[in-house]
């Protein structure tokens, strides 16, 4: 694990985080938008490059230039949904706000409570396109993309389990359908579904199947399908790492 030294934030800022969290719970519950909010948080963070220290969860995804990246099709909807709440909390950085929203999206759908440390600063320059995972690719691609972020095999499989939420939309990704029978509940059903083979009406992407094709990925899939607590524990660690890529790292 990368050692962290979190910045001191003022009491007023901490209180704003807590109030914002309550407002986000209300919005995400009312609009059933946890899946797209989680996707926004992930795609915001997943552009980090551990070598060049560029990209990452620093709020640049709000810019039209980054929203126009192919991997971010449809995420303008999430930005627009969240904007009225962000306007209530001008003190918060977009960087913190989007990662806080991702934490709430997991928690409010029955998933684990992920620790949240405030203090990310907004950056201006969006990262180059092409740093996010592509659904049509296989094992090597997953390791390349997540390795560039500084994440490992366990993180890859645990984060893949986030596909328990939501669905694919043909006009956004070229694929259609949900991964699990209940796409608004965060649980370990993603792993059960991919192990049980393709089913009518449910989706399996090439990147999902890749988890079964690899001797290092497969044991994690089997473990998480059998033990939801183990999945939640590893997911929490992986989500926290993703949400803090390039943030508060000790030199």
UniProtKB/Swiss-Prot annotation:
Q: What Gene Ontology molecular-function terms does this entry list?
A: heme binding; L-ascorbate peroxidase activity; metal ion binding
Which residues make up the annotated site Transition state stabilizer? 39
Please state the Enzyme Commission number of this protein.
1.11.1.11
PROSITE patterns per the UniProt record, alphabetical: PEROXIDASE_1, PEROXIDASE_2, PEROXIDASE_4
* Swiss-Prot/TrEMBL catalytic activity: L-ascorbate + H2O2 = L-dehydroascorbate + 2 H2O
Q: Which residues bind heme b?
A: 163
GO cellular component term, pick one? cytosol
Please list the residues that bind K(+). Answer: 164, 180, 182, 185, 187
The keyword Electron transport belongs to this UniProt entry's keyword annotation: no
The active-site annotation reads 43
- Cofactor list: heme b
Inducing or repressing factors: By excess light treatment, by wounding and by heat-shock stress.
Q: Which GO terms describe its biological process?
A: cellular response to oxidative stress; hydrogen peroxide catabolic process; response to oxidative stress
CDD domains reported in the protein's UniProt record: ascorbate_peroxidase
Q: What is its subcellular localisation?
A: Cytoplasm
Tell me the cofactor note.
Binds 1 heme b (iron(II)-protoporphyrin IX) group per subunit.
Question: What does the similarity note say?
Answer: Belongs to the peroxidase family. Ascorbate peroxidase subfamily.
Biological function: Plays a key role in hydrogen peroxide removal.
Q: What else is known?
A: Binds one cation per subunit; probably K(+), but might also be Ca(2+).
Q: What is this protein called?
A: L-ascorbate peroxidase 2, cytosolic
Q: Corresponding gene?
A: APX2
